């Protein structure tokens, strides 16, 4: 009694195994019947007549956009090329083969339309793996081979790094023309059901088109347009922002005082930094003379501005260090740069009242040409007063209130007049020389300060001009790529989308 369940289980397993064996035997028999060498030749096109067209349906499934090499102009993709056609020699009655409706056959054993990538860039025209084909009892053949294609892609560098590229995959039969096979699209666009997003590119569209040549009836191909848009974050952080910050340093050149002596050093340092970025760009984009990339245009624009800042800095330093002994300030320079322009540039020059005045001790004596009379009669009054006058008129006008002008005795004046006149004359000449020298120094210093202020006004003028041109140029260069539109390339012949 204990062996009864075991016997039942053994009987069921044997029955199932026998059923599977029958199905396997049916598939093996079907394979032998279909691919019998006397019945099937995989080199012959499956057509009932020489004029019959074999319709090949195609659909591209994008699995991954691996890379786009801008310098070598190559796009690498991982795709599945779905192909479907009908082979009348691969039909059977499923009831005669245990109900088998689907058969998987190795690709090398039946006829293939030998569709290859025409615009490949590495010499690999065919698919990577020849997978099995799915054949149905009605003769329909489905083949879904995977492939990694490296296709030639013409890179448009005009808006780099805000560019949008249109790369194509062109498929065509290598040995059959349009008089023998016809290539049609399953769907208007490529499939992205199993697509893995790229970190550098966004897929905008994947339209497909069937291209025929009216002048050549034997020509037909299927082309897929890969319209891809670059994600600019990487280049914005690593190229554009450093370039903009370097340009801001060039603006600070005009705000730097001329006395510090570092204006030219800063200008040349900024110019060298921009040259480094320009060399870095040349290693990324393709070496083409058809167009200049957007970031290259911006760098060239900034380098021109920095060169302009170097020239203006030389002019400003030349004006700043001018003196009355080397240059004469023209009236129009005074009128333009000292009176009119500062108002428009929001500049205000400190007035003479704001500068510290020179402190001179008050004069307690006023000496004029000696005359015969004076204002004192007694030695005590003469030596006791804080001031005395040689000229009687001065004595009358300058005597303090309550004091009585007195006259110096004539004999005293006559005795000391010779020596006194000589000393006074020498003193007057010395004082006059010192006063004239100080006056000349003040005038020269005033002219020097005027030249320095002119240099400051010129610096401020170029600062506003540089800022305006820099902002306008930056917006004018980087704004148009945000509104660019790209259409799929139609190719040299008329295209029909099925």
From Swiss-Prot:
Residues on the Cytoplasmic side?
Answer: 256-261, 322-454
The residues that cross the membrane are 240-255, 262-277, 297-321, 455-478
At which residues is glycosylation annotated? 36, 93, 138, 166
Q: Which residues bind Na(+)?
A: 262
Catalytic activity reported: Ca(2+)(in) = Ca(2+)(out); K(+)(in) = K(+)(out); Na(+)(in) = Na(+)(out)
Gene3D superfamilies assigned: Neurotransmitter-gated ion-channel ligand-binding domain, Neurotransmitter-gated ion-channel transmembrane domain
Name any one GO molecular function: acetylcholine receptor activity
Its localization reads: Synaptic cell membrane; Cell membrane
Q: Which GO biological process entries does UniProt record here?
A: acetylcholine receptor signaling pathway; behavioral response to nicotine; chemical synaptic transmission; locomotory behavior; membrane depolarization; monoatomic ion transmembrane transport; monoatomic ion transport; neuronal action potential
Q: Which GO terms describe its cellular component?
A: acetylcholine-gated channel complex; cation channel complex; cholinergic synapse; membrane; neuron projection; neurotransmitter receptor complex; plasma membrane; postsynaptic specialization membrane
Task: Enumerate the Extracellular topological stretches.
Answer: 22-239, 278-296, 479-498
Q: What is the regulation of this protein's activity?
A: Activated by a myriad of ligands such as acetylcholine, cytisine, nicotine, choline and epibatidine. The heteropentamer CHRNA3:CHRNB4 activity is blocked by the alpha-conotoxin ImI and AuIB.
Tell me where it mainly resides: membrane
Q: How does it sit in the membrane?
A: Multi-pass membrane protein
Pfam family membership, one:
Neur_chan_memb
**What keywords sit in the KW lines?**
Cell membrane, Disulfide bond, Glycoprotein, Ion channel, Ion transport, Ligand-gated ion channel, Membrane, Receptor, Signal, Synapse, Transmembrane, Transmembrane helix, Transport
- The secretion signal range is 1-21
User: Which Cys residues form disulphide pairs?
Assistant: 153-167
User: Any keyword Ion transport?
Assistant: yes
Is Ion transport there in the keyword field?
A: yes
Q: How does it assemble?
A: Neuronal AChR is composed of two different types of subunits: alpha and beta. CHRNB4/Beta-4 subunit can be combined to CHRNA2/alpha-2, CHRNA3/alpha-3 or CHRNA4/alpha-4, CHRNA5/alpha-5 and CHRNB3/beta-3 to give rise to functional receptors. Forms stoichiometries such as (CHRNA3)2:(CHRNB4)3 or (CHRNA3:CHRNB4)2:CHRNB3. Interacts with RIC3; which is required for proper folding and assembly. Interacts with LYPD6.
Family according to the record = Belongs to the ligand-gated ion channel (TC 1.A.9) family. Acetylcholine receptor (TC 1.A.9.1) subfamily. Beta-4/CHRNB4 sub-subfamily.
Supply the name of the protein. Answer: Neuronal acetylcholine receptor subunit beta-4
Taxonomic path: Eukaryota, Metazoa, Chordata, Craniata, Vertebrata
């Amino acid at each position: 009694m204990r062996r009864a369940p075991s016997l039942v289980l053994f009987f069921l397993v044997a029955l199932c195994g026998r059923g599977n064996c029958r199905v396997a035997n049916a598939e093996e028999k079907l394979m032998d019947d279909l691919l019998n060498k006397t019945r099937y030749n995989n080199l012959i096109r499956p057509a009932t007549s020489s004029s019959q067209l074999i319709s090949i349906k195609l659909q591209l499934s994008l699995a991954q956009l691996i890379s786009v090499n801008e310098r070598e102009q190559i796009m690498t993709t991982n795709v599945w090329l779905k192909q479907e056609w009908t082979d009348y020699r691969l039909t059977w009655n499923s009831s005669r083969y245990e109900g088998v409706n689907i058969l998987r056959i190795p690709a090398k054993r039946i006829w293939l339309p030998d569709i290859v990538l025409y615009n490949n860039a590495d010499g690999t025209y065919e698919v990577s793996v020849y997978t099995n084909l799915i054949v149905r009892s009605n003769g329909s053949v489905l083949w879904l081979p995977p492939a990694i294609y490296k296709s030639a892609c013409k890179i448009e560098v005009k808006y780099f790094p805000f560019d949008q590229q249109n790369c194509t995959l062109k498929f065509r039969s290598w040995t059959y023309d349009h008089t023998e096979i016809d290539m049609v699209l399953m769907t208007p666009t490529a499939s992205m059901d199993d697509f893995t997003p790229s970190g550098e590119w966004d897929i905008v569209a994947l339209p497909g088109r069937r291209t025929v040549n009216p002048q050549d009836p034997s020509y037909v191909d299927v082309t897929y347009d890969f319209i891809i848009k670059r994600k600019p974050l990487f280049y914005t952080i690593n190229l554009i922002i450093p370039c903009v910050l370097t340009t801001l340093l060039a603006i600070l050149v005009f705000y730097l005082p001329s006395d510090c002596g570092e204006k030219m050093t800063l200008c040349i340092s900024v110019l060298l930094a921009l040259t480094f970025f320009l060399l870095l760009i040349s290693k990324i984009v393709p070496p083409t003379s058809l167009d200049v990339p957007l970031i290259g245009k911006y760098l060239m624009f900034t380098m021109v501005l920095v060169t302009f800042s170097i020239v203006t800095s030389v002019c400003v330093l030349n004006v700043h260090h001018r003196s009355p002994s080397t240059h004469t300030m023209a009236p129009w320079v005074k009128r333009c740069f000292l009176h009119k322009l500062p108002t428009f540039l929001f500049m205000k020059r400190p007035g003479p009242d704001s500068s510290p005045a020179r402190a001179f001790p008050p004069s307690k004596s006023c000496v004029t040409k000696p005359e015969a009379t004076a204002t004192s009669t007694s030695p005590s009054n003469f030596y006791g007063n804080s001031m005395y006058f040689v000229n009687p008129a001065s004595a009358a006008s300058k005597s303090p209130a309550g004091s009585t002008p007195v006259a110096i005795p004539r004999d005293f004046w006559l005795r000391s007049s010779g020596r006194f006149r000589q000393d006074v004359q020498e003193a007057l000449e010395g004082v006059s020389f010192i006063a004239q020298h100080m006056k000349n120094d003040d005038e020269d210093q005033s002219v020097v300060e005027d030249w320095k202020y002119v240099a400051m006004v010129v610096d401020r003028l170029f600062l506003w001009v540089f800022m305006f041109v820099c902002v306008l140029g930056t917006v004018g260069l980087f704004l148009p790529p945000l509104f660019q539109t790209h259409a799929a390339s139609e190719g040299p012949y008329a295209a029909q989308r099925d």
